[in-house]
Amino acid sequence: MAEAFRGEYNQKVDAKARVSIPAPFRRVIEAGDPKFSGGRSSFVLVYGGDRSYVECYTISEMERIEERIRSLPMGTPKRRYLERNMITLALNMELDEDGRIVLPPKGREKLGISPDELKGGTEATFAGTLNKFQIWKADIYAAELAAEEEVLLPPGADMLSLLEETGL
């Protein structure tokens, strides 16, 4: 079984837009980077789609997604949408020697991090979601989490009840 991105981490984003990738996520990124041999590891940051966060995939996971997109008939609306939002609006990222990345301008725009917020310092939340992780502006993530739980579960309900629909 492949390694998974698990957990939730709040990380400072400095004035130069540098942010440290959580150490447990770095291990999964390394395991999913076929070219990694002890130096710098890489992953793919996707900023496409109608959402307020970016999604990050290991190189291996992104290759699987690309194969699935390639299997769709050329020129179909589904394929064009996926190509645009998963391939065109994506960047290869490389961790520096300290395990950091510079959040690219398009990623900062997607997260809603303004230049003024960078100057004053801001925080990003990294959320593991099995085969990928998300990067959110911390305050937006907290608000989204609260709203999502309110919609999906009544107070005191067992969250595993959501799996009943899958038959697992």
From Swiss-Prot:
<dbReference type="InterPro" id="IPR038619">
    <property type="entry name" value="MraZ_sf"/>
</dbReference>
<dbReference type="InterPro" id="IPR035644">
    <property type="entry name" value="MraZ_C"/>
</dbReference>
<feature type="domain" description="SpoVT-AbrB 1">
    <location>
        <begin position="8"/>
        <end position="51"/>
    </location>
</feature>
<dbReference type="InterPro" id="IPR035642">
    <property type="entry name" value="MraZ_N"/>
</dbReference>
<dbReference type="GO" id="GO:0009295">
    <property type="term" value="C:nucleoid"/>
</dbReference>
<dbReference type="InterPro" id="IPR020603">
    <property type="entry name" value="MraZ_dom"/>
</dbReference>
<dbReference type="GO" id="GO:0003700">
    <property type="term" value="F:DNA-binding transcription factor activity"/>
</dbReference>
<dbReference type="InterPro" id="IPR007159">
    <property type="entry name" value="SpoVT-AbrB_dom"/>
</dbReference>
<keyword id="KW-0238">DNA-binding</keyword>
<keyword id="KW-0804">Transcription</keyword>
<comment type="similarity">
    <text>Belongs to the MraZ family.</text>
</comment>
<dbReference type="GO" id="GO:2000143">
    <property type="term" value="P:negative regulation of DNA-templated transcription initiation"/>
</dbReference>
<protein>
    <recommendedName>
        <fullName>Transcriptional regulator MraZ</fullName>
    </recommendedName>
</protein>
<dbReference type="GO" id="GO:0000976">
    <property type="term" value="F:transcription cis-regulatory region binding"/>
</dbReference>
<feature type="domain" description="SpoVT-AbrB 2">
    <location>
        <begin position="90"/>
        <end position="140"/>
    </location>
</feature>
<dbReference type="InterPro" id="IPR037914">
    <property type="entry name" value="SpoVT-AbrB_sf"/>
</dbReference>
<keyword id="KW-0963">Cytoplasm</keyword>
<dbReference type="InterPro" id="IPR003444">
    <property type="entry name" value="MraZ"/>
</dbReference>
<dbReference type="Pfam" id="PF02381">
    <property type="entry name" value="MraZ"/>
</dbReference>
<comment type="subunit">
    <text>Forms oligomers.</text>
</comment>
<keyword id="KW-0677">Repeat</keyword>
<dbReference type="GO" id="GO:0005737">
    <property type="term" value="C:cytoplasm"/>
</dbReference>
<keyword id="KW-0805">Transcription regulation</keyword>
